[in-house]
Amino acid sequence: MYQFQQDNRYFIFNFDRTFEQASEFFQAEFWQKQERVIGSAKGRGTTYFLQTEDWFGVNCALRHYYRGGLLGKLNKDRYRFSALETTRSFAEFHLLQRLYEAGLPVPKPIAARIQKGKLGICYQADILMEKIENAQDLTALLQTQTLSKETWMQIGRLIRKLHDLQICHTDLNAHNILVQQTEQGQKCWLIDFDKCGEKSGGFWKMQNLNRLKRSFEKEVGRMNIQFTEQNWADLTAAYHQ
């Protein structure tokens, strides 16, 4: 782990050294010039998928942090600075590293950056993380096929492991679960841990699960995904084992 500063930019890398191109790593234009952009996905902004296995050991996803809602129309990507470790990208980096070290199937964090404005009051943020290969988000997959009972149970066990660590995924929904096709079968991953973190007690855990169920029910109507009450029963049975 290597943390350093260049002028008004702060970096953390999951390596024991720095890179001359540290700042360029967080610019899509740099990767486009290198002809290393291998795909992209649209959300609040564009996430770029990068061919970086020869540099970082894995291919990466590059994401810039954008605000949502009405506030996002007035201020699309600036956040108030209070402490480095609580900035959006550094906080997500450290949480992903904690979960990765605990053995949960989450993307390995590669690097994070914040860039302060001239007055040092606000900052912009970016993160580089592992790209999960041969994977689709659950909603895309469920538009074309059903999942086995074992895969639904795998999702339930995964969420239980997360909750046992007292980590609340505040945006737990069907889009933030990836299903990867491997030689051993389907493997489920959790992604997008922005604004997530540790939460004490247990009252919130069923609320978190119910949030996930509502997202499935919403996508049944919106995207015509294949989801049944039996699927949910299999998921929750594994969660409660």
Label each residue range with its predicted role:
Residues 25-136, 160, 164:
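Conserved ATP-binding subdomain of kinase catalytic cores across diverse folds
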Residues 116, 179-183:
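Short, low-complexity Ser/Thr-rich regulatory SLiMs
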